[in-house]
Curated annotation (Swiss-Prot):
HAMAP family: PurN. Homodimer. The keyword Transferase applies. The gene is purN. GO terms for cellular component: cytoplasm; cytosol. Keywords: Magnesium, Metal-binding, Purine biosynthesis, Transferase. Pfam families: Formyl_trans_N (PF00551). GO terms for biological process: 'de novo' IMP biosynthetic process; tetrahydrofolate metabolic process. It comes from Mycobacterium tuberculosis (strain ATCC 25618 / H37Rv). (6R)-10-formyltetrahydrofolate binds at R74, R100, I101, L102, N116, D150, A151, G152, T153, D154. The active site is at H118. This is Phosphoribosylglycinamide formyltransferase. Coiled coil: none annotated.
Length: 215
């Protein structure tokens, strides 16, 4: 029987957010991190120039950049981003629109503590075209997923999901915009639950102390 992985509660949790794009998920976490919210963003890591880095700087959050092109191999980049992330001593890492696959060095250090979001109800429609694939298949309901990151593409243990109906006349843009709203709220709730209650992972099953719900 596989040995359980137990990640203890860490509130108030130190968050490192990895991002490559507009920073909408990062902004949601920054906006949430007030009052008694059980997590704070302590650093943002990027792999390119992007709006997310600007949002972090505007919020006086330290930013570090680890570009793949600046390293002789993907393995070397993996070592570098692991070290840069570890320097901020995170309790949790959030991959928030980060357009790189995290490697074995990173996962050996942060597995069970690294979250990702996906704009579909996994395991359906993984990968970068989840919204378009759901529309092409003709589903009537899709949604958002928050999961732990593993070595695969959107294959890690699922922490939380929320359905989003597909409306008549939806195209990829309109559907994706509605999913993004749910995705942001679900991520904020999942981070809070993980920070407060921790998680136990056995194989593909992740169990937290309470169910993740969004209002």
């Amino acid at each position: 029987m596989q040995e359980p992985l137990r990640v203890p509660p860490s509130a108030p949790a130190r968050l490192v957010v990895l991002a490559s794009g507009t920073g909408s998920l990062l902004r949601s976490l920054l906006d949430a991190a007030v009052g008694d919210y059980p997590a704070r963003v302590v650093a943002v890591g990027v792999d390119r120039e992007c709006r997310a880095a600007e949002i972090a700087a505007e919020a006086s959050v330290p930013v570090f950049t680890v570009r793949l092109a600046d390293h002789p191999s993907r393995d070397a980049w993996d070592v570098a981003i692991t070290a840069a992330t570890a320097a901020h001593e995170p309790d949790l890492v959030v991959s928030a629109g980060f357009m790189r696959i995290l490697g074995p060095q990173f996962l050996s250090r942060f597995y069970g503590r690294t979250l990702n979001t996906h704009p579909a109800l996994l395991p359906a429609f993984p990968g970068t075209h989840g919204v378009a694939d759901a529309l092409a298949y003709g589903v009537k309901v899709t949604g958002a997923t928050v999961h732990l990151v593993d070595a695969g593409t959107d294959t890690g243990p699922i922490l939380a999901q929320q359905p989003v109906p597909v409306l008549d006349g939806d195209d990829e843009e309109t559907l994706h915009e509605r999913i993004k709203v749910t995705e942001r709220r679900l991520l904020v709730a999942a981070v809070a639950a993980l920070a407060t209650h921790g998680v136990t992972v056995v194989g593909r099953t992740a169990t937290m102390g309470r169910k993740v719900t969004i209002g």
